[in-house]
């Protein structure tokens, strides 16, 4: 099991190292046979190679079975031309591997309901996974353009595009609570009708998973009023962009949010948070999202579902016992990671 490690910039190297400590502990205990190779990416790669996604890193990604990414960017590189900024490396990475499904879990951990902007009784038990189609829809549809008098974009999906992201959602639901909500706007958009029909066809191949449909406007309301009732949510690119950001505020801190991007090539696992250059090197970064991204890697890249859940349980206990500064505690990166490791033992 070969992993390409891309620590990136800012707090990226610190939180990635925390995740690697957890993976090494599991490897030692379970004999997983994990192998790691570290490559420069983002701003660090610009400094070394003049571009954010250089050829050695590209080759390393191609040869790996999974990518564990830290974070990219920072004020040091903000003045560069857009095509060579660190963030452009992320787009190039995703495109090079044809990563068409973005998975964004949002979980309110037991005992941390107070962090959520919602009332505690509403936030309690929230554990939702947003599966967003990543490479199609209105962001990429043609024709598109703008004149002095008007502007236009095209919302377009093919059947294979919808089918493949729907399968990702149903497969994920099988490992969770076996319930999928498909989100569209089928009452006014032909693309929505097509999306709904195609997801229903895919769903027939998963008789053990319940399927429900919601219009996107109603879904936004439900995610605020009763988020705990949802398991897996699958939707198109633009709706997924909006709903995943809405869901991301439910736990109360970006430091708790991992993500995965899956597709035809090497899958990428990374925290949702940015590089936080203001706290880089201070040893106070919350590594939870990076550790949970590693757990997602175990599950989605290597099929080690039970070990992934074991990591999640250890993190949940550590958050209560030694919370990091962004959650109102005082545990630095190393101290928090040590608590996670203790609960894994």
Swiss-Prot record:
What does the record list as GO biological process?
L-leucine biosynthetic process
Q: What EC numbers are recorded for this enzyme?
A: 1.1.1.85
What catalytic activity is recorded?
Answer: (2R,3S)-3-isopropylmalate + NAD(+) = 4-methyl-2-oxopentanoate + CO2 + NADH
Cofactor binding annotation: Binds 1 Mg(2+) or Mn(2+) ion per subunit.
Its domain of life reads Bacteria
Q: Hey, which family's this protein in?
A: Belongs to the isocitrate and isopropylmalate dehydrogenases family. LeuB type 1 subfamily.
Q: What's the stated role of this polypeptide? A: Catalyzes the oxidation of 3-carboxy-2-hydroxy-4-methylpentanoate (3-isopropylmalate) to 3-carboxy-4-methyl-2-oxopentanoate. The product decarboxylates to 4-methyl-2 oxopentanoate.
Record's keyword terms, sorted: Amino-acid biosynthesis, Branched-chain amino acid biosynthesis, Cytoplasm, Leucine biosynthesis, Magnesium, Manganese, Metal-binding, NAD, Oxidoreductase
The residues annotated as site (Important for catalysis) are: 139, 185
Q: Which Pfam families match?
A: Iso_dh (PF00180)
Keyword NAD listed? yes
How does this protein assemble?
Homodimer.
Q: What is this protein called?
A: 3-isopropylmalate dehydrogenase
Name the Gene Ontology molecular function terms of this record. 3-isopropylmalate dehydrogenase activity; identical protein binding; magnesium ion binding; NAD binding
Q: Which gene encodes it?
A: leuB
Report the subcellular localization: Cytoplasm
What are the names of the required cofactors? Mg(2+); Mn(2+)
Tell me the residue numbers annotated for binding NAD(+). 74-87, 274-286
Cytoplasm among keywords: yes
Cite the annotated pathway: Amino-acid biosynthesis; L-leucine biosynthesis; L-leucine from 3-methyl-2-oxobutanoate: step 3/4
Q: Locate the residues binding substrate.
A: 94, 104, 132, 217
> Which species expresses this protein natively?
Thermus thermophilus (strain ATCC 27634 / DSM 579 / HB8)
Q: Which InterPro entries has this protein been placed in? A: IsoCit/isopropylmalate_DH_CS, IsoPropMal-DH-like_dom, Isopropylmalate_DH
Major localisation: cytoplasm
Binding sites annotated in the UniProt record for Mg(2+): 217, 241, 245
């Amino acid at each position: 099991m070969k992993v390409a490690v891309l620590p990136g910039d800012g707090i990226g190297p610190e939180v990635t190292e925390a995740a690697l400590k957890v993976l090494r502990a599991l490897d030692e205990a379970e004999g997983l046979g994990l192998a790691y190779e570290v490559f420069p990416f983002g701003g660090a790669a610009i400094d070394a190679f003049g571009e954010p996604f250089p050829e050695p890193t590209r080759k390393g990604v191609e040869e790996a079975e999974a990518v564990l990414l830290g974070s990219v960017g920072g004020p040091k590189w903000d003045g560069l031309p857009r095509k060579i900024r660190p963030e452009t490396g992320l787009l190039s990475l995703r495109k090079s591997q044809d990563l068409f499904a973005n998975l964004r879990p949002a979980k309110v951990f037991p005992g941390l309901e107070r962090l959520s902007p919602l009332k505690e009784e509403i936030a309690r038990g929230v554990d939702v996974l947003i599966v967003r189609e990543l490479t199609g829809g209105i962001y990429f549809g043609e024709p598109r353009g703008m004149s002095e008098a008007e502007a236009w974009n095209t919302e377009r999906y093919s059947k294979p595009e919808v089918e493949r992201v729907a399968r990702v959602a149903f497969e994920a639901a099988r490992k969770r609570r076996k319930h999928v909500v498909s989100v569209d706007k089928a009452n006014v958009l032909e693309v929505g009708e097509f999306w709904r029909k195609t997801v229903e066809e895919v769903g027939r191949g998963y008789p053990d998973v319940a399927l429900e449909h919601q219009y996107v406007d109603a879904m936004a309301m439900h995610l605020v009023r009763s988020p705990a009732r949802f398991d897996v949510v699958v939707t198109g690119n633009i709706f997924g962009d909006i709903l995943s950001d809405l869901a991301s505020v439910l736990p109360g801190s970006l430091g708790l949010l991992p993500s995965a991007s899956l597709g035809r090539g090497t899958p990428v696992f990374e925290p949702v948070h940015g590089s936080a250059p203001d706290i880089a090197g201070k040893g106070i970064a919350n590594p939870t999202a990076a550790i949970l991204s590693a757990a997602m890697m175990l599950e989605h890249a290597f099929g080690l579902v039970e070990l992934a859940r074991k990591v999640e349980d250890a993190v949940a206990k550590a958050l209560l016992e030694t919370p990091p500064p962004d959650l109102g505690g005082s545990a630095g990166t190393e101290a928090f990671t040590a608590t996670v490791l203790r609960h894994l033992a």
